[in-house]
Amino acid sequence: MATFILEIGTEELPARFLLELQSELGVRFLDSLQSMGYRPTEVSDYSTPRRLVVCIKGLDMIQPHCEEVVIGPPINIAFDKDGNPTKAAEGFAKNLGITIGSLSQISTDRGEYISGLKVKGGIPTKEVLARLCPEIITALPLPKRMRWGNNPFTFIRPIRWIMALLDSDIVPFELAGIHSNRNTVGLRNNNVPFIEVPSSTDYYMLLKEVGNVILDPNSRKDSILQLGNKEAQLIGGVVNWNERLLNEVIGLVEHPYPLLGTINSVFLNLPREVLLTSIETHQKSFGILDSQGNLLPYFLTVLNMTPPDLALVKQGWERVLQARLEDARFFWNEDINSSFDEWQEKLTHLIFLDPLGSIAQKEHRVSLLCEWIAKYIPTSNAEEARKAGSLSKVDLVSKMVEEFPELQGVMGGIYARHKGESESIATAIAEQYLPSGPDTDVPVTDLGAILSIADKIDTLVGCFGCGIIPTGTADPYGLRRCALGIIRILIEKEYPINLHQLYTRAQDNFVNVSWKLAPEDVLQKLHEFIIARLKNYFLALGYDTLVVEAIVSTQTSQLWSIKDRLDSFILLSQHEDFSQLVQTIKRVINIIKKQDKETEIVLTGHWNPSLFKDTAEKVLAEKLMIAVNKFNQESQTASLPVFMMLLKLQPAINTFFDQVMIMSNDIEVRRNRLNLLKALLLYIESLADFSVLQI
């Protein structure tokens, strides 16, 4: 059995895309080879800043023989009425390389078709890989593409070399003007320009020992953690390992070498967030903490090699960071000597979106929304919420945020605290941009959550009104993130806020705005957009697609109750009588749907008990009223007992169908019975849309 290694050598790849790209490379090779009959024993993928690598073990040297059933044209097209093959059948057989007599008939969901066996295999694996490699590399899903030189080929970064070996044989192909060979490249600035690899089994050893490259990202991570912790222990501290930054640094180095640098103690007077932003975001380094979690005057950076002059490199890193911190100290001193009134005036000249006015106007709208939202949350104070909203954007014109945009909100909270605002208002301002992504927490405080909802819904309504609606992958204003943030807050904080009222209230706060879309169209499109995000949210949590569709389509205003509905519905679906219940409900749906289409009878769901003639319809009406009252007593939250009431209704529904002539000759009796079924359906649809279920 043979081992295949492919190494795509490039200019420095963006660190944030590395792990996804290496995984995609491995998955695509595995899927392609398995579809060709191969059964590799192991597929490994790796990446460094300058290479993507896949290693496949346990390959046959010759592609295994396998048969594939290929479906051709329908039987009535493949043969004429006399049973003679048509040109369609002849062409199909020719494409498969078989005779007409070898064709078979196969039954499918779409009817009767002809089929044939296509035999694959017998090709040398080296030839298979030579064709497969350029196909897979070209088809890799890349977040960005670029061209270089005169070649029309595009990739995420320029390709500089390609090594492709099947055991000791070169797998020959050409891509982007580069021919595959047996050469790899070591660490940049290494004395050896190219490393010849005799066989795929020699690759790892040569790359590490001669090239000085640690190929496996997990090994680089372990090395950084081990050596970094050791450096921090020398000065009695611990490294503040930021997982997101650590994963980025892993993608920036091929041979990690942690270096401990010092910070002038005078800078420790700066806010912790400012220090960490300067260290982590701008220098890609890590802070050092004492045993109490306070920052020490040190930082840890990770070099890409062992430097020839460690002291000189250390001095350079310290000088660059000190310049950053000097700027930060200057901005801090400038900001704390400025007033919020000055900043509020500057906000009037800072445009949010041209049709929507200034940031000052947005801040005012947000403050009004905060006051309105707070009234639905018993633990919050409406006046305090309005105050938090009115100060939410002042830090956008501060010197610190101009220099460090990622600190917006955070600095607003710090400045609010520094200028005497309450702790709750300061915390709310700091939390307003949470959650910043699907994996970050929602605001801890109710006031912060209120401010976050208000800010996000104002942005969504304003952008949709201007016709700025995300399409495809384009979302320059982060509207998907805004929608998901609102969804998560309402669900995780269990706030009883009606979505439609929230949209309308936000829209009403816009004054003298020329909308590109009609106001009612804005609300409709926005609601569809948020519901799509809502469904994706629950699918990501592992809920079944049809279950999500059944529940979400019936309850789109009170998001806080949807998770309980989903869980209750799942428990109901596990009952032994659930399948029969669904069939019964679908019968009700079909009867009402037919009446709506084929008759002029308008069904309202209101019935007249005096028109009941049979006991079965009286019993069904009584059972339905009990279920509806139970639902209303539960404040329409559709808990498990409410869903289980459907099972208690089922016998009455079945008896109604068995004993009652719905389509009575008496038009009034008929209308009354149909309205009873309509009322039943309206109640059922308030719980779930059973029509989407496939049972």
Curated annotation (Swiss-Prot):
Pfam families, per the entry: DALR_1, tRNA_synt_2f
Presence of keyword Nucleotide-binding: yes
Sorted UniProt keywords: Aminoacyl-tRNA synthetase, ATP-binding, Cytoplasm, Ligase, Nucleotide-binding, Protein biosynthesis
Name of the top EC class for this enzyme: ligase
EC number: 6.1.1.14
Domain of life (superkingdom): Bacteria
Subcellular location: Cytoplasm
GO term, biological process aspect, one: glycyl-tRNA aminoacylation
InterPro entries: DALR_anticod-bd (IPR008909), Gly-tRNA-synth_bsu (IPR015944), Gly-tRNA-synth_heterodimer (IPR006194)
SUPFAM superfamilies per record: HD-domain/PDEase-like (SSF109604)
GO cellular component: cytosol
GO molecular function: arginine-tRNA ligase activity; ATP binding; glycine-tRNA ligase activity
Coiled coil: none
Family of this protein: Belongs to the class-II aminoacyl-tRNA synthetase family.
HAMAP family, per the entry: Gly_tRNA_synth_beta
Protein name as catalogued: Glycine--tRNA ligase beta subunit
Organism of provenance: Lawsonia intracellularis (strain PHE/MN1-00)
Lineage, opening ranks: Bacteria, Pseudomonadati, Thermodesulfobacteriota, Desulfovibrionia, Desulfovibrionales
The encoding gene: glyS
